[in-house]
């Protein structure tokens, strides 16, 4: 494993790259395969750690997983599902991944029980799982806290319940979808996340036989069905990776063609990219991003849930804004601790200060909670 990367800078980034499937979709699509005993096939799969983690967890539960890394194709056959006997090994495999909590719904449907190891997180916020647990318990699951994690039991078939999310959490929306599709009755999920990756997961579930409708007011209705089949699907491109390449081209005065990038899922990013001073050309096979010359412009920006400016685009954009003329303000409203990387940028010569106050936008849920969530 590489422990250090040495980068020789000072050269504009030029050339062509290809993005693979979205990291915020693929692991969840793999979990969805557990909802059917039939084989599911997923294409455009990226080489990321979460794919390895979910593959190992699927195998631990009795599924067969074949991954052609060169072709980017995963074939998953659940077959006879069972609970792993070694919870310690399961915890070790999962590491800091949040994915295991999403196994709960499919396992409760097939086995009537699920075990979730102690969940880690990341360095950008607490990411609590209380929304997930509330959904599972409302649908009829009983939770037993054990030393190594949580044991969830469904003594009767899960039954649909209305679900309202106090915040449009992506993870809680995924949990509701994966649990509701085979629960008895109709689930109405309000204040749901509607990110492109959520829409692609819904497309997968619909291919499997689910009945799901999405309204314009963040309401998703899921009619439970008795049985689902396997799916064949090509994952949508990773808009985070595409935005990162775009910002790298902008920060270095370069010119990069990102094959596979899609305009539809990057509308808010493209608007910001152009406002800062970048230029782009949407083509059939991808998007070309380049620095057209002249000075980059500073700006005030606020991250938000979709269709707002994605929080994952904030890091690479801040790097590009260090090259802009004037003072930029970035207000992070999705995760409470997402400016730790600015310390490294300051060591490299940037001038960035973080604040607890809501700057450059409307007050957000972190405004009175003592989190450094604004940067200047």
Question: What positions do the PLM features span?
Answer:
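Short, structured segments at the rim of ligand-binding sites
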Residues: 1-376
